Amino acid sequence: MGETPSTNPPRNSGESRALLRTSAAAREIERRLFLKQGLSVGALTLLTGCDVTDTSAVQSVLDGISRWNDRAQALIFNPRRLMPTYPESQAVKDFRYNAYFGQNQIPKIDGASYKLNLSGLIDRRAAWTLQDLYQLPQESQVTRHVCVEGWSMIGKWTGVPFRTFLQRIGADLTAKYVGFECADGYYSSIDMASALHPQTFLTLKISDEILAPRYGYPLKLRIPTKLGFKNPKWITAIFVTNRFPGAFWEDRGYNWFAGV
């Protein structure tokens, strides 16, 4: 496995087909997001000075706006500001399932043979078993998960603070990015400042129970400072890099920083 994943669609054939079948749905979500942002044809023409029928010119402008938005969010991100926490009584036990495929296509992962692979700017790259992860000190948080589709839910998440894990494996904490690869072919990445935020967890449990497959068993990233698509499930690999790694939906037009 290289230091960074490909920015092409997921590479595992079965999982690739599952995600590629969702491309039409993804384009529809992107269209809705664009409309929600309130950029009418007239407003876009006025803003860009472009003929909006020139799709390449418009896309170039939108890409530039997205990059500017990412930079602006990174500049105002406060790594010491905590997201609100809630009483356990407000945590939803039957948390909503959300993915771009049905529950019959959820990856089937054998916990006994599971390995978390590490690569990139990391001193100790030996793979971790699930039992290795369970033996690490764990903490819990009750925070709100915010989806880009417009819904949110409060959940109780238990796992290992990601900062603790990165320190344990000897990751270069001055590097720019941390990336994730998942059993369903999904891939994601976050900035190092967000990775080190005290509420960013490698999650092993939800509502005090081992993650069910639909919630990302055996390992999910919980990062309440970002939108839901930045919380990858079914994680099988983590890497640290200074090269921008991209991410699945962001490579298709979503904002990369995606702060809440």
Set out the residue ranges of the language-model regions.
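Structured, non-membrane catalytic/scaffold regions adjacent to prosthetic-group chemistry
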Residues: T53-V260
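N-terminal twin-arginine translocation
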Residues: R27-K36, L44-D63
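Intrinsically disordered, low-complexity segments enriched in small/polar residues
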Residues: S6, P10-N12, L47, Y100, ...
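N-terminal secretory signal peptides
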Residues: M1-I29, L33, A43-L44
